């Protein structure tokens, strides 16, 4: 297992995901310094759907409760976890659909879930929407839709990892996931496929390395007599998650 590659990806992915998630927030009139009217029907000239309006209101409420940075970090980490779990499952043939989400069967960055979209059989899949997006050649939008449906379908067997995505985490799913240099592309490029095979401990290493910079920041602050907040306790107390614990989780 190439732990250097895993660390390189995880550390970079945290920064990248927080930035991308935050960028989606801007699209909906939400920044660290300013939040537009929570009841707005449109933001930046874009008319919100009923679902978007509801999700945006939930996001704003969460930010008011926890703070902007904390919420952006939580959403970024949620998607990191989901991407990691999906990659592990597709490589090991654990996805119920047996259709890869990130690559084709040769491990090329050509998601099989897109090429097989009209043949998919997943709970919650609106085939009419699939055809509509395919006919309009909205590949990126189609991919995001299929990704969300796949996560929701996995809720039945892994409810802890794949909670139903009907809230602001869907709203903040980053754009351009199919581009060169995206988090998904880099995950495939940097971490050898063999490292995912039957080695569930990779999830533990990803977790540890993802939080490593934050952990360093927390302890650096401690040396300056800055107390650890409840939000930073997980990063400060993290330990490597061995194989048997990951399987139990």
Q: Which sequence ranges carry the predicted segments?
A:
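Preference for the N-terminal adenyl/adenosyl cofactor-binding alpha/beta module
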Residues: 1-248
């Amino acid at each position: 297992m190439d732990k250097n590659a895993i660390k390189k990806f995880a550390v970079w992915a945290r920064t990248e995901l927080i930035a991308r998630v935050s960028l989606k927030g801007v699209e909906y009139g939400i920044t660290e310094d300013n939040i537009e009217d929570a009841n707005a029907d449109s933001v930046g000239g874009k008319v919100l759907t009923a679902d978007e309006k509801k999700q945006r209101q939930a996001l704003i409420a969460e930010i008011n409760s926890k703070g902007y940075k904390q919420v952006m970090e939580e959403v970024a980490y949620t998607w990191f976890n989901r991407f990691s779990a999906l990659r592990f499952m597709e490589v090991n043939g654990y996805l119920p659909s047996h259709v890869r989400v990130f690559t084709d069967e040769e491990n090329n960055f050509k998601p099989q879930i897109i090429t097989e979209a009209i043949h998919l059989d997943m709970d919650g899949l609106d085939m009419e929407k699939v055809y509509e997006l395919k006919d309009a050649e909205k590949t990126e939008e189609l991919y995001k839709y299929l990704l969300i449906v796949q996560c929701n379908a996995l809720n039945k067997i892994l409810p802890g990892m794949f909670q139903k995505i009907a809230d602001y985490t869907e709203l903040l799913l980053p754009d351009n996931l199919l581009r060169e240099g995206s988090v998904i592309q880099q995950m495939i490029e940097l971490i050898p496929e063999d490292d995912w095979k039957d080695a569930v401990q990779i999830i533990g290493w990803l977790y540890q390395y993802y939080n490593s910079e934050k952990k360093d920041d927390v302890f650096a602050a401690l040396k300056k007599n800055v107390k650890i907040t409840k939000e930073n306790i997980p990063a400060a107390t993290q330990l490597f998650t061995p194989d048997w614990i990951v399987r139990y989780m």
